[in-house]
Amino acid sequence: MNLNFLDFEQPIAELEAKIEELRHVGHDAEVNISEEIQRLQEKSHVLTEKIFANLTAWQIAQLARHPNRPYALDYIDGLFEEFEELHGDRTYADDPAIVGGVARFDGRPVMVIGHQKGRDTREKVRRNFGMPRPEGYRKALRLMRMAERFQLPIFTFIDTPGAYPGVGAEERGQSEAIARNLAAMARLRTPIICTVTGEGGSGGALAIGVGDRLLMLGYSVYSVISPEGCASILWKSAERASDAAEAMGITAHRLHELGLNDRVVEEPLGGAHRNPEAMMESLRAELREQLQALEGQSTETLLADRYQRMMAFGQFRE
């Protein structure tokens, strides 16, 4: 399996390459080298723990963008049953960068919505690299209204570089579509649980990110601008993206310290892409707990608490 090791993971990559080489040799040789393979595997595990215990904000941002990372459809397949995708905004078109539909979670009917990136080149282009156009956000709002009508809890999965800034998208009202979603989600009379699974890129993420709970995976990020974009503005050079990532405080744990997310769901060692099954189990348990807590509240309490959450953001304290 191609794990697509990042630059800071190269020492791990070298060890894994040696392990793979020994496995091939072991099939052909009469000598038993299983002990050597086990020793290298243990060494790789210790090295991985050491590297991942000291990640910078920029390295975490790179992990959030990892091409092997599970996307919305992977989480839908792993966490929900009987998913039926719904298409179109009933105004202009369908947008494959946003996927959504009805499903069951622990047997309970729910609505699921998320950003979807592509794996190969053709799929990336079709999904517009996970950058929704206005019709994507309007489709999401249509599904949320449907969920409210039928009293279905809403789960959203956020993973986008941002809303698509193309001319056509702007002509069709990109900012209006995002703003309308923010206003509508603040008042929807059904529980909403949002999870940042990778990149939480500015308004493009917020447009499906207003809810009663905001969860973030351990190696996800959330920011008003990309580190490269911030560095280009402040220092006129995208090469200072690492400095920008640190200064903006974009990581899940830093945002939790600031009270901007409700829970950090820890990822398996090496990231969600290294062990998707373990990631699904951890996230399923967290989503189940949060949904049970929210369904125990009255609609009036739900809306009042959601309003207070929104009003608490951005407060300055000495």
UniProtKB/Swiss-Prot annotation:
The keyword Nucleotide-binding applies. InterPro entries: Acetyl_CoA_COase_a_su, ClpP/crotonase-like_dom_sf, COA_CT_C. It is found in: Cytoplasm. One of its GO terms (cellular component) is acetyl-CoA carboxylase complex. GO terms for biological process: fatty acid biosynthetic process; malonyl-CoA biosynthetic process. It comes from the Bacteria. Residues 32-293 form the CoA carboxyltransferase C-terminal domain. Gene3D superfamilies: 2-enoyl-CoA Hydratase, Chain A, domain 1 (3.90.226.10). It catalyses: N(6)-carboxybiotinyl-L-lysyl-[protein] + acetyl-CoA = N(6)-biotinyl-L-lysyl-[protein] + malonyl-CoA. Keywords: ATP-binding, Cytoplasm, Fatty acid biosynthesis, Fatty acid metabolism, Lipid biosynthesis, Lipid metabolism, Nucleotide-binding, Transferase. One of its GO terms (molecular function) is ATP binding. Its EC number is 2.1.3.15. PROSITE patterns: COA_CT_CTER. Pathway: Lipid metabolism; malonyl-CoA biosynthesis; malonyl-CoA from acetyl-CoA: step 1/1. NCBIfam families: accA, AccA_sub, PRK05724.1. HAMAP family: AcetylCoA_CT_alpha. Acetyl-CoA carboxylase is a heterohexamer composed of biotin carboxyl carrier protein (AccB), biotin carboxylase (AccC) and two subunits each of ACCase subunit alpha (AccA) and ACCase subunit beta (AccD). Belongs to the AccA family. Component of the acetyl coenzyme A carboxylase (ACC) complex. First, biotin carboxylase catalyzes the carboxylation of biotin on its carrier protein (BCCP) and then the CO(2) group is transferred by the carboxyltransferase to acetyl-CoA to form malonyl-CoA. This is Acetyl-coenzyme A carboxylase carboxyl transferase subunit alpha. It comes from Alkalilimnicola ehrlichii (strain ATCC BAA-1101 / DSM 17681 / MLHE-1).
